[in-house]
Structure formats: C-alpha cells, structure tokens
Amino acid sequence: MKLEMICTGEEVLSGQIVDTNAAWFASTMMEHGIEIQRRVTVGDRLEDLIAVFQERSLHADVILVNGGLGPTSDDMSAEAMAKAKGESLVENIEWRQQLEDWFTRNNREMPVSNLKQAMLPESAVMVDNPVGTACGFRVKLNRAWLFFTPGVPFELKHMVKEQFIPFIRDEFNLDAKVALKKLLTIGQGESALADKIEPLELPEGITIGYRSSMPHIEIKIFARGEKAIVLLPRVTGHVKMVLGTAVVAEDKATLAEEIHSRLLNSGLTLSVAESCTGGMITSQLVDFAGSSSYLHHGLVTYSNESKVRVLGVNPATLDDHGAVSIPTVEEMAKGARAILDSDFALATSGIAGPDGGTEDKPVGTVAIALATRNGVYSQMIKLPRRSRDLVRSLSAAVAYDMLRRELLAEAVIVDYQSIGRFSK
C-alpha cells in the first residue's frame, strides 16, 4: 500500500503555523508499521487543490487529506474533490441532522454557514466525526482512496485512530503483526548513539530508527512479524545495555511523563523552585492529569530578592557565591522542600543567554539541585553554544533525571557525553 498525505491551508503553506498534524500522523502511522511515501502542502486555492487531488490519485493507493472542511469561504476541500472527480456537491442528510443535533446539545443556534459542512461530493462515503462539526468523508479517484479529515488536531486524531486506521487495514489486508519499543535518551548525540547501536546484529524483521526531539533523542525499535515480536524484548535489552545511562525512559514521550508516571499514586510529593527554567519543570508536569496528587508547588524565583524572601536563601550565600552556584541552588531546593515538607524538591539557577555570561560562568552554566529527606544532591552543568530554549529544556531534563535516579535508588549524578559538568 502506498500512503500519501495532502495538507491544506494557506497558514500552513506560508509557515504562519507549524504543521503538527502532519508530524503526528506520520509518527502514528510509523508506530503501526506503515510509512508515508509523500507529503504535499497546498494553499487555499481551488485550482491548486483540484490539480493535486487529480495528480496524486494517479500514484497513491490511499491519501489522507487534512484540513479545509470548515464552514468558511477558504474551506474548499469538498468542493475541490467534487470538481476533481467531475461530480456535484450534494447535501448529506445524515450529517445535516448531526449538525443540528450538535448545536442543540450545546444550546447554540446553528449559523447558516455551517450547512456547508453537510455538502459532500456525490460519490462520497461519510466518515463520522463525533467530536466536531466537520464531516469527514472518503472518495475513490483513479487508483486512490482520498480520506478527508478535519484540521483541528483533536478531531483529526480521533478520526485517524477510530476510522482511518481500521479502514486501511480492512481495505488493504494489512498485517497487524507489528510491535514497537521506544527508548528515550538524553546527553548523547544521534551519531554517538548510532555508533553504539549499529554494531549490534539485528534479527530478521527488526529495524531501528532515530528521532531527535531535543532535549531528547528517541530510539524506535520496530518488530514486524511474529518471530521478530518474540525477540523484541531481548533486542531492547541489548540496546539498553550498550547505551547505558543515556536511556532514561521506555515508551514515554518525555522525561516529564516518566516522572509523572512514577510519582502518580506513589504517595510521594514534589516541590520545585526555578530560576532560569522559568516554570518549565512545573509546567511540563501539570500537562498531565493527576499531577496535583504529588505536586505541592512550583515557584519561579527569578530575582535574588525572591530567592531570599520566598525560599529563605541566605543573602550571604548570594553575595559570596552568586545566584548561579551550587550553594545557592542547594538552599533554593531546601527552602522549596521545607515550605510544605515535600519528599523532594528540585531547583535550578543558570545563565540561559544569549547574554549574561562571564569568564568563570559562561552562558550555558546551570546549577541544579535535588533536595530529599536525607540530603541534597547538586551539580553545575555546562551547556555552551546552545540556544536559550535548549539550555532551559536540557536543564529541566537533567533535573528530572536526577529525581528519576533517586526514585530508582540509582546514582543521582552521572556523566552525560554531550553535557559537561563543573567540578565542585
């Protein structure tokens, strides 16, 4: 099966928004052992949409079309598909009724413009969208099925998981015997990871891929076929062994997700005091439902005054060592933990740049501390020649990893190949 994707929208084509839908769709398909062969982005011009539908339908077996199903004048996907096939738009009575029901349930009057969303190409097969007003549909043109989906990410994901994937599996008799293991790493570059993994002899049916999503690099181990699936745990173990401390999570998208899963329902509590990371550590945890069960508070103590008055940092410590120092960040962590007697507290203070560095403490210098009931762990890392955003995200990741290792009763401070560390 040859799968392609057509992304629509002037804002996507012009770069006004980042096309996260395409990235999510490609990643999701890959997890099911299906690779996208081509992706095309086209603006909101009727003639361009017609042309790309006609041209790509000669080459693909199935095409996921994303966007252009709304009620406004620049939503042209249904009209373009009808013209590409040489047929009329007709009202889908079933979807019109669903639209009217949707607005009634939400105590709203349906605008006349929304009736456009019930107008589908004459040969279209309706694809249900229980979470929105944009009607999905599919049409056969030349050799391809074109499967039309909403541009709203939540609606797209719902439709792909519940409608698109089952459809292509049935239509093309795809073998569902695919398994995937993901290993999340930090502190080593993609080439360094590959140098360690490539010498491994992989059994037939198992392949390895890499995805950089800083501050992490994700290792994907695919197993296709029953024999390969049986061997997947063993291969995963070998990969983890050669990568050592670089592996920080399995089947998690971020270290924040790993920390959340370990603290949730654990009875343990966490507080956070952040300077250079500016609430990033706390924010990433709050993204997950249930984080209130373990997260006591997150404090952004950016100024020296706030470090003193909120966290109880000794003014003499700041005078003698500066805000970016091991003594200061240790006192920040202790102070954050003491406020509500949390089990753990993380603290960061650093120079994210692009300015503010000195010869002794250049841009990219970050002090990180973990306070526990039994003591404090701390380190000052070096992240030179990184952007401000990357300095902050790498610092948050190292802080998470310190906590993760403490939760696993492992050495809290470890060496990362691509992250330097000052001696205390």
Curated annotation (Swiss-Prot):
InterPro entries recorded: CinA, CinA-like_C, CinA_C, Competence-induced_CinA, MoaB/Mog-like_dom_sf, MoaB/Mog_dom
Superkingdom of origin organism: Bacteria
Listed Gene3D superfamilies: CinA-like (3.90.950.20), MoaB/Mog-like domain (3.40.980.10)
NCBIfam families: cinA_nterm, molyb_syn, PncC_domain
Family indicated by similarity: Belongs to the CinA family.
Database matches in PANTHER family: NICOTINAMIDE-NUCLEOTIDE AMIDOHYDROLASE PNCC (PTHR13939), NMN AMIDOHYDROLASE-LIKE PROTEIN YFAY (PTHR13939:SF0)
Protein name: CinA-like protein
Organism lineage string: Bacteria, Pseudomonadati, Pseudomonadota, Gammaproteobacteria, Alteromonadales
